[in-house]
């Protein structure tokens, strides 16, 4: 329970009317509403998950809300990021999110951080809030949030979406598991943590998962005991079903991290990343002075749509099955790419663990098409 000594605050007639449906609930009443008003929540990411979470947190009467996001609104966001409209395209997500929140609840104190959460700023930002809602979609950001919350003793409410499935959990709650405990226990093939742009997502799915994250935050503030600590709640939109899975602890969860995240990490099996940009890759391919193989670690469907010339498709889900054994990777250098970065980081660490010579291509196929164009690029004809 947060704000267990919440002081009685003065409510206007408008506020009594606004929160009247809360005030008549015996589980909330005036005391619970005061807890909400005196609490602070930081939402890292104002996209698919952040949009519904921010809307309902503001409407519920959270007193202070922080938003971390440096993205610009794109038309492709509108399918799932319900805070934004066509009139907002090209504008800052953080700025527009604040504007919309204040339209919902003008009494809310909204702070925006128009930046990306990184190891150099995470502690300073996160320390200002009681609860952190994780609306990110990549390994690095989630580990930074997890480690910062552990250091500052903050609650980390995790959410993730992939195609038609989503999951929610609460980490670092009263000595419970953290994100690293969960991530180190799930199957590689189910955990490339692809972004929506990489793998697609049903538009309404983040609305469900983001709302569940906001619900967890409110329950914690009000002191409810039925929190998703040590449990992953998984939702399948195709079958309209929920499942719960227990998280197995992999280490003493209260131990502080030896150092903050300063590089790309995957679980506890990380390596100094050897990487090149697409210009350097192009030059290496022209020289052709050593034995190499280009590995496209995206899905088969993405590979068939477009891929680099002579690239071999090795989806992440197939790595656990050792489908790479016929490629003789031990005899050559492997250049790895995906759509942007997230899956190639995962693949890099996995193959390095097998002691293969691996180089990651920064920015992936997206960077290649933006900088180099269609040269040495196969694109499926219509």
UniProtKB/Swiss-Prot annotation:
Catalysed transformations (reactions): [molybdopterin-synthase sulfur-carrier protein]-C-terminal Gly-Gly + ATP + H(+) = [molybdopterin-synthase sulfur-carrier protein]-C-terminal Gly-Gly-AMP + diphosphate
MF-aspect GO terms: ATP binding; molybdopterin-synthase adenylyltransferase activity; sulfotransferase activity; thiosulfate-cyanide sulfurtransferase activity; ubiquitin-like modifier activating enzyme activity
Chief subcellular location: plastid
PANTHER family: ADENYLYLTRANSFERASE AND SULFURTRANSFERASE MOCS3, UBIQUITIN-ACTIVATING ENZYME E1
Keyword Aminoacyl-tRNA synthetase in record: no
Annotated Gene Ontology cellular component terms: chloroplast; cytosol
Subcellular location: Plastid, Chloroplast
UniProt keyword annotation of Methyltransferase present: no
EC number: 2.7.7.80
Protein name: Probable molybdopterin-synthase adenylyltransferase
Similarity-based family: Belongs to the HesA/MoeB/ThiF family.
Biochemical pathway: Cofactor biosynthesis; molybdopterin biosynthesis
